[in-house]
């Protein structure tokens, strides 16, 4: 089987197999020959005895080192609800008696293809694991169809000895352990593959049946003198225009295609602070709010999240990307489309609001760009309130589960849209997205674009923000269906916090450092020795006076950064007997100003302090504080510091 099956193992943060010891028992949700074989193979590859060999330590002799929380019985049509609770209780009693001193329980979840369930699916009924025979048939086809995409998740180990210290008797301790792990598995499944998803048709029907959309349809009939059937069909058309058509098969194929694309385009993807995301992924509604630098952003975050064992987000994309051929693929990858403005279309607004609200209530991870469009300068754009306002209002009306915003920073060393941005900044009109433009853009596949950086910011809990702004918001929302006016203030504050959160996890890469130094020199040229000194100064400032704990910086030395810039085709060298001169061509200077602007906020305060001493060697502390207090608020507002 393992000539065909390919597994990827993801362990919980801090998981150290060397510290597990010899007395280890794995916990799985349900039995299955293929799952047990995968676990055995993983243990053998990790130089551990396979669980099927049993658990044999002083005081314990079990035929298997696996506890199943739900076991299949021998009924023909239905699986029994029996479990391995007696085995778990024997283990707990043995530890309680001191032989062995402790047993470590390791929850293990194995996913074949990671396909979310679909409500109302005939295929789900036919292949449901609630039917013993069908369950085996389903697993056979899963091995054949999804054997190349198997994810093994090892959760944080649980000490039986520590659980016994709570003072419960062995029977109750075993039951509590089983219940806690069972809840963990359910949450982990949702985090990994996403919640149950409706068919697109079912989702559209839910939207049209909702009171808010029904009221909007009636208003449409009155205002535009339509027949009720016409207004309803118009609403249905809007819903189909908006809704994603999520396909796990497209996600799996996209992962393979994108892996090869990234290998062709980039020299690696650096991921920072992923632990922050994993810490809040379980049990929360996640809304990813990244900065918007490139069209690659749409693909990059989904790829990074999926590769690290989390469910792909549904992404809000502009209707301009709903192109022939491309649009359906994006839609099946989780994209849902929105018009640039729908303030004057109440029916469309009602349909879109309900679609977003239903997805948030189901726990579907969402991604959208609060800047509204891609930055052409490299600096963050002010937050647009539209999607944030809809999200906050939806949560206030129906807080089904905690909602957490996760800021995400994207850093590039070269953009595939660089030339088009250059044209736009030169005054040319923005080129509209089209299929022909997409085909012409494929020429970038011949180029290299350096490294990509994806950093996750500190999560922002919406409920906490609402509690600060309006302590009685829950009671007010329950008592009235009106849109509370105070929400707009929360939305403005939230937008500012998200942008500040993005900047707080910026990635200072070699291109950004070189651009920062060279663009501040006359004629974009400098002696190599001076360039080395200036890069070392910037690195020392970033390390010695850090902007924040989330900022990541290149680990290359100043010399290596210059070498990198030359190999990357960014720097030019002119030899001279008094010392080589390093310079930027004019065209390169315009392009790399984008990457200097990515990190301008990091050097803003040191630069302000340096400017205060520009024409004097000394300055009283009071005068320095006065200068900073007058200028800094403008910098903070402009650069989202």
Residue ranges: model-predicted function:
Residues 1-641:
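Membrane-interfacial terminal anchoring regions of lipid-handling membrane enzymes
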């Amino acid at each position: 089987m393992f000539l065909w099956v390919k597994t990827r193992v993801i362990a919980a943060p801090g998981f150290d197999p060397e510290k597990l010891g010899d007395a280890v028992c794995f916990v799985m949700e349900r039995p299955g020959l293929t799952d047990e074989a995968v676990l055995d193979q993983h243990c053998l590859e990790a130089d551990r005895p396979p669980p099927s060999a049993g658990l044999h330590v002083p005081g314990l002799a079990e035929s298997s080192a696996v506890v199943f929380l739900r076991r299949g019985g021998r009924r023909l049509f239905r699986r029994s609800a029996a479990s391995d609770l007696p085995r778990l209780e024997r283990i707990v009693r043995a530890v309680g008696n001191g032989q062995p001193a402790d047993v470590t329980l390791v929850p293990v979840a194995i996913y074949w293809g990671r396909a979310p369930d679909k409500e109302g699916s005939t295929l789900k009924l036919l292949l449901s694991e609630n039917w013993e025979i069908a369950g085996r048939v389903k697993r056979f086809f899963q091995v054949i169809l999804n054997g190349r995409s198997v994810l093994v998740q090892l959760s944080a180990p649980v000490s039986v000895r520590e659980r016994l210290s709570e003072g419960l008797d062995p029977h109750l301790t075993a039951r509590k352990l089983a219940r806690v792990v069972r809840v963990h598995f359910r949450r982990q499944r949702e985090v990994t593959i996403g919640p149950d998803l409706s068919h697109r048709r079912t989702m559209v029907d839910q939207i049209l049946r909702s009171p808010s959309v029904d009221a909007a349809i009636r208003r449409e009939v009155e205002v535009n003198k339509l027949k009720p059937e016409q207004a309803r069909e118009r609403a249905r058309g809007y819903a189909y225009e908006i809704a994603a058509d999520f396909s796990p098969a497209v996600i799996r194929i996209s992962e393979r295609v994108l892996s090869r694309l990234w290998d062709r385009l980039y020299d690696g993807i650096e991921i920072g602070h992923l632990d922050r995301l994993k810490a809040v992924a379980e049990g929360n509604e996640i809304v990813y709010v990244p900065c918007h630098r490139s069209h690659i952003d749409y693909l990059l975050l989904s790829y990074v999240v999926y590769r690290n064992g989390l469910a792909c987000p549904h992404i809000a994309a502009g209707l301009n990307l709903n192109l022939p051929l491309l649009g359906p693929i994006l839609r099946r990858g989780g994209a849902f489309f929105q018009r640039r403005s729908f303030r004057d279309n109440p029916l469309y607004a009602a349909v879109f609001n309900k679609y977003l609200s239903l997805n948030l209530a189901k726990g579907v991870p969402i991604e959208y760009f609060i800047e509204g469009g891609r930055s052409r300068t490299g600096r963050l754009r002010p937050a647009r309130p539209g999607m944030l306002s809809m999200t906050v209002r939806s949560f206030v009306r129906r807080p089904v589960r905690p909602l957490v915003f996760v800021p995400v920073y994207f850093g590039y060393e070269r953009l595939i849209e660089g030339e088009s941005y250059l044209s736009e900044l030169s005054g040319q009109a923005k080129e509209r997205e089209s299929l022909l433009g997409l085909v012409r853009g494929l020429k970038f596949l011949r180029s290299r674009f350096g490294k990509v950086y994806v950093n996750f910011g500190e999560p922002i809990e919406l409920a906490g923000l609402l509690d600060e702004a309006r302590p009685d918001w829950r009671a007010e929302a329950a008592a009235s269906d009106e849109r509370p006016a105070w929400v707009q203030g929360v939305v403005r504050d939230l937008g500012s916090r998200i942008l500040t959160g993005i900047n707080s996890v910026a990635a200072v890469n070699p291109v950004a450092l070189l651009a920062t130094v060279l663009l501040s020199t006359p004629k974009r040229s400098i002696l190599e020795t001076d360039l080395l000194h200036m890069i070392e100064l910037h690195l020392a400032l970033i390390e010695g006076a850090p902007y924040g704990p989330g900022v990541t910086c290149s680990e290359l030395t100043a010399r290596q950064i210059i070498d990198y810039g030359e190999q990357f085709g960014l720097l030019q060298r002119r030899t001279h007997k008094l010392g080589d001169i390093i310079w930027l061509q004019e065209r390169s200077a315009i392009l790399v100003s984008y990457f200097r602007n990515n990190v301008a906020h990091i050097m803003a305060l040191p630069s302000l302090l340096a400017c205060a001493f520009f024409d004097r060697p000394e300055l009283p502390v009071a005068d320095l504080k006065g200068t900073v207090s007058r200028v800094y608020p403008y910098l903070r507002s402009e650069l989202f510091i």
